Every structure is written in structure tokens, then in C-alpha cells.
Amino acid sequence: MSITAERKQELIAEYATKENDTGSPEVQVAILTERINNLTDHLRGHNKDHHSRRGLLKMVGLRRRLLSYVQKEDRSRYQDLIKRLGLRK
């Protein structure tokens, strides 16, 4: 259900803006998106797992706030990020 340390390092390497960058909004959104996708797959098979559903909603809200921040700061970074993650049409 959670992501492995190797997968997290791959995401950090792919979305980092500079070396040793683990806290930028892009990296945080990428990791959250991976966790959201994993949890969504879990909930398809376990539709009565309401505790996990609550965690999913909290993660979606956090990702939305981070994306809103990136959009306010730099529109081109926002467009690039959602395109790379495949979030919106």
C-alpha cells in the first residue's frame, strides 16, 4: 500500500529541481500522487476500508494545496508538473 524506499528515491531523482532536493513542492506532489494512486487501487478491492479512505482524502487535499501553491508561484512549473504527472486534461 505504501511506496518502497527505492521508488521514493526514483521519484525524488526525477522531480528534484536541484541535487539533494527532497522538499520542493514538485517532489512532494509526485510522492503524494504515487501514494494516492496506490491507495486508490487498494480501495477498489476493499471498498469498506473507511479509515484508509479518510487518509486518501487528506492526501488529496494536501496535494491540492501544494499544487495551488506552485500555480501561484510559477504558472509554467505548474503546467509542466501536471503534464508530467498526468493529473489534469
Swiss-Prot record:
Please name the GO terms of the biological process aspect recorded for this protein, alphabetically. translation
Q: Which UniProt keywords apply?
A: Ribonucleoprotein, Ribosomal protein, RNA-binding, rRNA-binding
Can you tell which superkingdom this protein's organism belongs to?
Bacteria
GO CC terms: cytosolic small ribosomal subunit
Query: Which chain regions cross the lipid bilayer?
Result: none
Pfam annotation, one family: Ribosomal_S15
Kindly give the InterPro entries that the UniProt entry links to this protein.
Answer: Ribosomal_uS15, Ribosomal_uS15_bac-type, uS15_NS1_RNA-bd_sf
- Gene Ontology terms for molecular function: rRNA binding; structural constituent of ribosome
PROSITE patterns under this entry?
RIBOSOMAL_S15
Function text: One of the primary rRNA binding proteins, it binds directly to 16S rRNA where it helps nucleate assembly of the platform of the 30S subunit by binding and bridging several RNA helices of the 16S rRNA.
Family assignment from sequence similarity: Belongs to the universal ribosomal protein uS15 family.
Subunit comment: Part of the 30S ribosomal subunit. Forms a bridge to the 50S subunit in the 70S ribosome, contacting the 23S rRNA.
Q: What is the protein name given in its UniProt record?
A: Small ribosomal subunit protein uS15
Q: What is the lineage of its organism?
A: Bacteria, Pseudomonadati, Pseudomonadota, Alphaproteobacteria, Magnetococcales
The gene from which this protein is expressed is rpsO
